[in-house]
Structure formats: structure tokens, C-alpha cells
């Protein structure tokens, strides 16, 4: 647990609770709007703790029929591309491209509709053949695929670096960020926010942004607010080095095989999209879960992992 600050302010206009990718983004954008000196971000442990630090780091614009969601994806990609020049802190964004593949007629029809909408929204999308998929991503088995959809401007981002860049940008605009400062309660009067309570004392404020990640629901419950948010188990596998693997291959997503794939170091990251997820700690998320990893559940995930690895035959030959 991060050390508590020596002192805390007694007032802010906005208190942002949580220092993951969402909380730091909110703080950064409040700073852009001129609210920086009146904004306080409180992180219970260290920035990125919870779920941000081990996110897979995919930057995907494809997949939505929502105009709002698609515009946000475009904005986010552009933001990650320019933050380093603005802050001096890299986000790790690499526009290596992303390929969504379809192995059945139903998914192909769905993806063609998605592609048409995304093109309308300004996304660069190319429908490509199995041969072209193999050219772009040689480790993949492609003989059973019907087509792919290639977004050359998408790619990967480092979630820790991106969070730190947003935090630095927020500080540059006057936002105060305190680590080691868990919020114990949100204080209200007649249903209106008047402050937050911490172990170091109360802080008056007009607005609270609950960006507490997997703790958001239980924090909101203390104020009688329902946040429909539940942590779930998610697994990805990092293989041993694969000889000859190009580290700049595009990201490959194959929901039909329950998998997504991208190079990680000299090996491959294989993430799983299991059709039925497993909720984690439904009653309450442990307070000491800041940088927790879960032991593998081979009995539940084994069949999905085997199918996902079959898309990348070389992954079955290494550890």
C-alpha cells in the first residue's frame, strides 16, 4: 500500500476517486476545461492499481454501432498518439494495426455491417482475404477463415504508461493527485454531495466522480447508489519466446476461437473471450487486491485456451 500523504487539502470543487485509466482521464480532461486547480484525485493505493496495471492494452476502434462510442474510440486513439509530445511521457501507443477475423457466415455478415458503419464514421477499414490475413499475421492458421477486417491505424498501448501520461497532463493543468488516500465514504446532505471522508480527514467538495474501478459499486452503496459493476475473472497467457516472431505484428482478434493475440516481448499474448465469465467476489472486492493476480482455473478455462491456441499453432509448441 502506498504511503499516505503528510497532509490533504480541506476543500476541492471536484474529487475524482480512483487513479486508474478512467480516473486519470477524467482529471486530465477537467484540467483541459480549466478546472485543474479545483480538482483533486484521490487514489487508494498507487496509480494504476486494481485492474488498469494488467490490462491487455488493445486500442480498437472497430466493433460498435454507436456513434458516440466510435467517436470516443477515435478520440482516444488520437489522444494516446499525441500525449507524449504534450507531456514527455510515452503512452506506449503503437499503431501496428488490428485484424478482426470471421470463420462463419453469421459473423462475416455482422462484421460487414460493422465495417460499413465504421467507414461512415471515418474509420479506415479494409475487408481482406484469408491469404492477406496470413501475409499480415504469419503465425495464424487461416485455412478455415472466410475473411478479415483490417484497421491499420489501431494497435496496442501500454496501460501503465498511458495512465502516467494522463496523470502528468492533469498535474500540468493544476490537478492535485494524492496516492495512499482511500475514500471511506461520500458525504451528502439532503441527497447532495458535500464532501468525502478519508482516514486523514474530511474534504469538502461540490462534485464527486466515482472512478474506483472494481471497488466502485461497494463505494457507491455506502451512499445508497447502485452502480451496475461487477468484477470478473479474465485470463491471458504469455508464451515463451517463439522463434522468428515479428514484434510488430498487428493485433489479431478471433471471437470464434475465444481469443485475441499480439506479440509480447519475444512471445505471444493470448487473451481469452470465454462465452460465460466467472464473477469474482460478488459480495465485496478485497481491500488488498491492488496488484493481485489470480491462479489459473485450468478446469474451467482449459477448453477455451486449447481452442484459442489452435489459431496460433506455434503457441502449442512452446511453453
Indicate where each model-derived feature is located.
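Beta1/beta-strand and adjacent pyrophosphate-binding region of the FAD-binding site
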Residues: 8-22, 40
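Glycine-rich FAD pyrophosphate-binding loop
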Residues: 31-53
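Gly/Ala-rich phosphate-binding loop of Rossmann-like dinucleotide-binding domains
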Residues: 27, 31-32, 169
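Dinucleotide-binding Rossmann-like beta1-alpha1 core, especially the glycine-rich loop
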Residues: 57-136, 256-261, 265-267, 288, ...
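Conserved Rossmann-like nucleotide-cofactor binding loop
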Residues: 22, 47, 215
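Active-site lid/adjacent beta-loop-alpha segment flanking the redox-cofactor pocket in flavoenzymes
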Residues: 241-319
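Central helical "cap/lid" subdomain
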Residues: 202-250
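Helical element adjacent to the flavin cofactor pocket in flavoenzyme catalytic cores
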Residues: 149-207
